[in-house]
């Protein structure tokens, strides 16, 4: 049954999120399953999905939460702190080989991300943005910090530039600010 569902979610260009209402590409949803899809032998489709998404992101000059089947990029319900981290996670876990222009685009997006979501010390800014539960407004949740940390790790693994903070910063913050055990 699960294999049939995965087959139905493959459009030929990308993995859509749902067979129902949300029948387009959501970066967060894809990010949570990309590694599992690779392990299930779907690496070719994961790579194809990433190539398709990167093409549309580059055309729109922005990494967004969603892309419809026509390639229109948009944020729903609003810009999200986890979109770029999930994209870089997918690129890393799939072994996607970035070309020169994709690298340049992602490094530009990293600079934009750093200015928008992080303060000068690398901490997540206290601004409104979407994250795991879009209808809930958080103030710098552990999820947001963890995803920025994951992004820092992926940036290093992918050899990308223009993200000045290291994974250890976010590991330390999660323990000192969020762990209460």
Model-assigned labels for residue ranges:
Residues 2-13, 58-64, 121-128:
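Active-site-adjacent bridging/hinge elements
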Residues 1-9, 37, 91-98, 151-162:
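Alpha-helix C-terminal capping segments
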Residues 1-2, 102, 109, 170:
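Alpha-helical structural motif
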Residues 20, 40, 100, 135-138, ...:
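Charge-dense, low-complexity intrinsically disordered segments
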Residues 23-120, 145, 149:
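Aromatic-rich carbohydrate-recognition surfaces in CAZymes
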Residues 15-21, 70-74, 129-139:
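Active-site-adjacent structural elements in folded domains
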Residues 62-66, 121-130, 137-181:
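Catalytic cores of carbohydrate-active enzymes
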């Amino acid at each position: 049954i699960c294999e049939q569902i995965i087959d139905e979610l493959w459009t030929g260009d990308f993995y859509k999120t749902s067979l129902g209402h949300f029948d387009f590409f959501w970066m967060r949803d894809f990010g949570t399953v990309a590694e599992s899809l690779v392990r299930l032998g779907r690496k070719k489709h994961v790579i194809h999905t990433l190539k398709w998404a990167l093409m549309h992101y580059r055309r729109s000059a922005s990494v967004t939460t969603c892309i419809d089947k026509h390639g229109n990029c948009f944020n729903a319900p609003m810009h999200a702190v986890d979109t770029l981290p999930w994209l870089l996670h997918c690129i890393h876990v799939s072994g996607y080989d970035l070309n020169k222009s994709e690298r340049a685009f992602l490094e530009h997006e990293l600079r934009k991300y750093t200015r928008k979501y992080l303060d000068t010390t690398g901490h997540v800014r206290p601004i409104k943005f979407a994250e795991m539960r879009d209808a809930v407004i958080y103030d710098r949740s552990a999820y947001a910090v963890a995803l920025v940390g994951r992004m820092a790790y992926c940036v290093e693994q992918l050899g990308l530039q223009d993200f000045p903070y290291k994974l250890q910063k976010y590991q330390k913050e999660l323990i000192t600010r969020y762990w209460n055990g």
